[in-house]
Design a protein with these regions (language model features):
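Segments of small-molecule ligand-sensing domains
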Residues: 339-351, 362-422, 439
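Extracytoplasmic "Venus flytrap"
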Residues: 68-99, 119-126, 148-149, 215-223, ...
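Bacterial lipoprotein signal-peptidase II cleavage site
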Residues: 21-35
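Extracytoplasmic ligand/sensor domains, especially the bilobed periplasmic-binding protein
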Residues: 126, 141-245, 291-316
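Extracellular/periplasmic periplasmic-binding protein-like sensory domains
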Residues: 280-355, 366-368, 422-439
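Sec-dependent bacterial lipoprotein signal peptides
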Residues: 1-23
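Immediate post-signal peptide segment of exported/extracytoplasmic ligand-binding proteins
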Residues: 43-46, 50, 54-79, 107-113, ...
Length: 440
């Protein structure tokens, strides 16, 4: 009897020891991954994670701070964008900006882990709303980052206004038409295209250009930017547009347009993506001498400028950001980006815009004590005054949206060391980047 009792005691001791070991293991890092396009969820105490960039949906929860994992309710960031289709490259840039922001905060904020969830909408506005519905109603995101594509951003803001009311933080500029669905929740924090085009036209007129040819891919931003450009360059500056062409988005052979182009003082082009490099090369092959002026410098990345070589020198652009801006906040941002993406050169304005969208939302949470309720966090974001990588930014309530008062830059392609890149040559200081009514 005593022997059987002794055996029972020993069994209990072993079981208790095993239970304690399992409990200890429960505090260690755990990772569960399902390959895209299925959902990817990662929970880590000290593991650095990177969200997948293939199309589909992904959820990443990570707390990489050396101080240990955050334990509060997750803050969920949604990104509804065209990982496939003609906006895929732009989407990649924005994705890298979001990941840079998360890396800089060690994937946690105010004691809460930050989750990054994204969906591929193929840059289709109808699909974008379906994906937004999934992110909002199933994934329960707290904020929508993007979309970049203007028609998709307009449609998603309309859906958000009719559903959860969570804020939409834009990444790039948007046309004034998007104000019609802003619903008091859209933060167009990089500005309205119409005003951006206006300041570009103002600069070109002040530089003494009198005639211009305009050649654009036929999309919504092109029309908005050109309207602003013409107000300053033609209506106020007395200039003349000799030709104005809007061409299909997939065009890579520009010969029929270039051969008919009349001599002018400057050529304004809204050509991007796969067409950007061929356009500039063909422009020079046709012997056209007028300088190229590009609304928004992100249409030509450092990699594309390197491919073009010295023929890109002297190209002019406008934008709200360049990684060559000299201030301490930008130096920190650029260093963080280059640590994650050492082979890509410096961040462009889409990387910055996505980074700023994330940080602006999180700073709003800090201002309201961490309350993600739209009625609390939207006014908190609206009241922010921030020193950012592109300078001081304040938000202004405007036509049921929020637009920025910020510096706006004229840039020129110069060689910095051995690198061809965009360098600021003039600044419009603290201008309100709204629709035409906000221009001087």
């Amino acid at each position: 009897m005593n022997k059987r009792l002794l055996i029972l005691v020993l069994v209990l001791v072993v079981a208790m020891a095993a239970s304690a070991a399992l409990a200890a293991c429960g505090t260690a890092s755990t990772t569960t991954t399902t390959a895209a396009p299925a959902t990817t969820q990662t929970t880590a105490g000290s593991t650095e994670t990177t969200a997948a960039t293939s199309p589909g949906s992904s959820e990443t929860t990570a707390t990489t701070a050396a101080t240990g994992p955050a334990t509060g309710t997750p803050i969920k960031l949604g990104f509804d964008e065209g990982f496939t289709g003609f906006m895929a490259y732009d989407c990649q840039q924005a994705d890298e900006g979001i990941k840079t922001a998360l890396a800089m905060i060690n994937n946690q904020w105010m004691g809460h882990p930050v989750q990054y969830l994204f969906e591929d909408n193929g840059s289709d506005p109808v699909v974008a709303v379906d994906k937004a519905r999934k992110l909002v109603e199933s994934d329960k995101i707290n904020v929508m980052i993007g979309p970049i594509f203007s028609p998709a951003a307009k449609a998603v803001a309309d859906y958000l206004g009719k559903s959860s009311g969570i804020p939409e933080m834009t990444i790039v500029g948007q046309p004034a038409d998007n104000l019609t669905t802003a619903n008091g929740l859209a933060f167009i924090q990089t500005g309205i295209f119409d005003a951006q085009g206006y300041y570009f036209g103002k600069y070109l007129a002040e530089k003494g250009f009198k005639t211009a040819n305009v050649i654009n891919y036929d999309d919504t931003p092109a029309h908005a930017l050109t309207a602003g450009f013409k107000k300053a360059f033609v209506d106020e500056g007395g200039g003349k547009v000799l030709s104005e062409n809007y061409i299909p988005l997939d065009t890579v052979d520009f010969s029929s347009y270039l051969s008919a182009m009349k001599p002018a003082d400057v050529t304004v082009d809204w050509i991007f993506g796969n067409g950007a490099v061929p356009f500039v090369k063909q422009y020079h092959d046709y012997g056209l001498k007028a300088p190229l002026a590009v609304p928004m410098s992100n249409n030509y990345t450092d990699a594309q400028l390197a491919e073009l070589g010295d023929i890109s020198l002297g190209m002019i652009a406008c934008d709200y950001y360049a990684y060559t801006i000299d201030n301490p906040v930008n130096k920190e941002f650029v260093a963080a980006f280059e640590k994650l993406y050492p082979k890509e050169g410096g961040p462009n304005s889409e990387v910055y815009g996505a980074w700023q969208a994330v940080m602006m939302y999180l700073e709003g949470l800090k201002a309201d004590g961490g309350d993600t309720t739209p009625a609390k966090v939207i006014p908190a974001i609206a009241g922010l005054k921030l020193d950012t990588p592109s300078g001081h930014v304040e938000l202004v309530s405007f036509k049921n949206a929020y637009i920025p008062k910020r510096d706006f830059f004229i840039l020129e392609v110069q060689k910095v060391g051995d690198v061809l890149t965009w360098v600021p040559v003039q600044t419009f200081s603290q201008v309100l980047l709204g629709d035409m009514s906000t221009t001087p």
